[in-house]
């Protein structure tokens, strides 16, 4: 499942289940500001231009699993953590105990010029977590970032 969007320099797409995005821009540029779960069954991705109007396409990619599978029922847990407001915010969301990390995302709560995602990364350590970071570029725009961890477990 792929959804495409175009909206005068600021893109926002919401649809059921997803785990990735790509901003296809030309000219001045358009960068990602969000890719995160809204509910256990829906995802949102956003991008924006930076000081110069730069319309672009935003593609959001879906990877899905059925709720009922042969070995049981898939239960989803979404956890989130907010950063402090800063020019280069970072946050780490921990997976709920008893769940396996399957993905994550982030939403930047930017103010005027924008603060853009540069890091969406699952943990490589024993602590199951998902890290996110963003930064302002050229023009100061201290922002808050919310990191999300998406976990699942199979219940019989």
Spans of features found by a protein language model:
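Extracellular attachment/recognition segments
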Residues: 1-156
């Amino acid at each position: 499942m792929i959804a495409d969007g175009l909206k005068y320099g600021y893109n926002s797409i919401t649809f059921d289940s997803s785990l990735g995005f790509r901003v296809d821009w030309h000219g001045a540029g358009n960068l990602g500001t969000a890719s995160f779960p809204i509910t256990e069954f829906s995802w949102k991705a956003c991008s924006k231009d930076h000081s110069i109007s730069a319309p672009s396409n935003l593609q959001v990619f879906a990877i899905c699993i059925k709720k009922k599978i042969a070995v049981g029922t898939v239960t989803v847990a979404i956890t989130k953590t907010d950063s402090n407001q800063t020019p280069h915010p970072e946050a780490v969301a921990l997976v709920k105990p008893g769940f396996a990390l399957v993905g994550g995302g982030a939403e930047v709560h930017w103010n005027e010029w924008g603060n853009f995602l540069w890091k969406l990364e699952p943990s490589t350590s024993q602590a199951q977590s998902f890290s996110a970071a963003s930064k302002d570029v050229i023009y100061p725009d201290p922002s808050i970032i919310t990191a999300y961890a998406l976990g699942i477990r199979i219940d019989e």
